[in-house]
Amino acid sequence: GLAGHGGCVVAGKQTAGRGRRGRSFYSPEEAGLYLSVILKPRGSLKESLLLTAEAAVAVYKAVLRITGISLGIKWVNDLYYNEKKVCGILTELEWEAESGEFSCVIIGAGINVSQDEADFGPEVAPIAISLAQALGTAPDRTWPPG
């Protein structure tokens, strides 16, 4: 289940996607890849804070491998193409009240896969882009690719 280390939930749609500082994250049905991974890292809280950067690098490598697109990483949680956002990453810590220590880390990522400009709407279109827009065609959503 999701409660175990390395558990992952993947969704084709989010109804309440959110980013940092409670901002909303536009997540239309079957247009993106939305996922959450639970980790129970050993080590200090300081080391766990690096997980957001490590997640950004993992998304960067996956997108490069699958599409050939080299994204830019905006420290520490966003990936961009031509100065427009392709992916947002949110990391949250769960705390145990009794011990005052964190029990797990949940890393969520939302990747814009097949939206076009009209899908984003007038407010989001100037600042967001999908992999399909960057490629000029919708990427293959099957795994393994090819």
Per-range role (PLM):
Residues G1-I66, C87:
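N-terminal lobe of the biotin/lipoate ligase/transferase fold
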Residues A11, L71-W75:
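General beta-strand structural signal in soluble alpha/beta enzymes
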Residues T15, N77-L79:
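Acidic, glycine-rich active-site loops and adjacent beta-strand->loop/helix elements
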Residues R20-F25, V76-N77, E117-F120:
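Intrinsically disordered, low-complexity boundary segments flanking structured domains
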Residues L35, D78, G110:
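Residue-level signal for inorganic ion chemistry
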Residues L45-K46, L50-L71, Y81-G146:
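Long, positively charged amphipathic alpha-helical accessory segments at protein N-termini or as interdomain linkers
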